[in-house]
């Protein structure tokens, strides 16, 4: 199970791996991407510098299997980076940075099927593809083609090229080494971590058009310093790994900051969400940690008199709830007894 030293302070349910890198089963050398197989209760971890994928049980973190080895031939990996599971087509998709291609593996058999792409900037060419995501509603595969500073859209039916968007820059729908991509299926959106622009961009998954962005460089709540991984939870909240600020941050689907998780973690790189179990997995220090999403977001949300007043807009669901909040704040203010951190124990009522 590895080093569980964070459990006491961070409510981490389980940890996989050790701080020391290695090549044994259950040990990593640069875990670079995560994907939950929600139907089988498995967590797939891309073990980048070991050029393989390891598979673990979501129940206890025990090692289940592995596949892949270093090389340039089909079915071999050269610094794999991103991973996505396409349940509709029994498919695992994996991007390779140094082979500049995308591999397709059977999900049920964990066996190689095919690969596409080579280095370049053409329709089916890539330059350091970092991540991959599945847009199940529009039957598309979306590749974060990092050094080409673009998103490439493929058909998930036959993995054919559809179109691409983006170029290098800092304007809307421009990128500077985008790291990872996630899909908000309910709102038909693509969420992209724009690493060197220190922001997250939100695009339409229908045509790739720009919708809005959030984040700016800094270490205040809601600011980012090289955002890398991201995922969407079952309430539409956007979870971002804030690499140089050594924390995870949660935002509403509108991009408003909710909460931060920074209890002793260092250099978090990627994050994934298990919608069936309500779990968030993230990587740091050659380990994979798993926490409860709802517990983190409820337990760490605080109202701070020295910052923004009241609760974020997503909490304002009923008139009675807001009346209760305002009444509580007004009463405490009148008595001059507002504590530094007033915990809102009202999540069970929302």
Could you describe each region identified by the protein language model?
Residues 295-350:
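Cullin-RING E3 adaptor/co-adaptor recruitment helices
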Residues 267-300:
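Blade-level signature of beta-propeller repeat domains, shared across WD40, Kelch, NHL, RCC1
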Residues 43-44, 91-93, 140-142, 190-191, ...:
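Conserved beta-propeller blade signature
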Residues 58-60, 106-110, 155-158, 205-207, ...:
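Short loop/turn segments that connect beta-strands within beta-propeller blades
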Residues 36-40, 85-89, 134-138, 183-187, ...:
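Residue-level detector of Asp-centered blade-edge/turn motifs that repeat once per structural unit
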Residues 48, 97, 146, 195, ...:
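Short loop/turn segments immediately following the C-termini of beta-strands
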Residues 2-32, 61-81, 112-130, 161-179, ...:
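Gly/Pro-rich loop segments of beta-rich domains
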């Amino acid at each position: 199970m590895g080093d569980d030293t964070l459990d006491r302070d961070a409510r981490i349910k389980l940890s996989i791996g050790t701080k020391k890198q290695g090549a044994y089963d259950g040990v990593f050398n640069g875990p670079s991407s995560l994907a939950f197989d929600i139907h089988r209760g498995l967590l797939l971890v891309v073990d980048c510098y070991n050029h393989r994928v390891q598979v673990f049980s979501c129940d206890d973190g025990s090692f289940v299997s592995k596949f892949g080895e270093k090389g340039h031939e089909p079915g071999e990996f050269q610094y794999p980076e991103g991973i996505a599971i396409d349940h509709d087509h029994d498919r695992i998709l994996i991007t390779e940075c140094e082979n500049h291609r995308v591999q397709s593996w059977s999900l049920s058999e964990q066996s190689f099927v095919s690969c596409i792409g080579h280095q370049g900037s053409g329709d089916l060419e890539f330059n350091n593809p970092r991540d991959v995501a599945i847009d199940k509603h529009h039957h598309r595969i979306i590749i974060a083609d990092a050094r080409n500073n673009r998103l490439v859209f493929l058909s998930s039916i036959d993995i054919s090229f559809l179109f691409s968007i983006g170029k290098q820059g800092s304007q809307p729908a421009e990128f500077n080494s985008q790291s990872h991509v996630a899909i908000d299926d309910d709102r038909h959106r693509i969420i992209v971590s724009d690493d060197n622009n220190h922001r997250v961009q939100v695009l339409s998954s229908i045509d790739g058009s720009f919708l809005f962005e959030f984040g700016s460089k800094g270490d205040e709540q809601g600011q980012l310093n090289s955002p890398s991984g991201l995922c969407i939870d079952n309430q539409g909240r956007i979870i971002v790994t804030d690499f140089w600020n050594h924390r995870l941050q949660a935002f509403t689907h509108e991009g408003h900051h909710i909460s931060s998780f920074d209890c002793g973690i260092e250099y978090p790189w990627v994050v994934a969400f298990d919608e069936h179990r309500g779990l968030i997995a993230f990587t740091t220090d050659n380990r994979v940690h798993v926490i409860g999403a709802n517990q983190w977001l409820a337990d760490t949300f605080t109202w701070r008199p020295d910052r923004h007043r009241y609760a974020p807009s997503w909490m304002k669901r009923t008139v009675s709830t807001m009346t209760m909040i305002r009444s509580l704040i007004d009463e405490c203010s009148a008595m001059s007894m507002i504590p530094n951190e007033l915990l809102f124990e009202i999540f069970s009522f929302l």
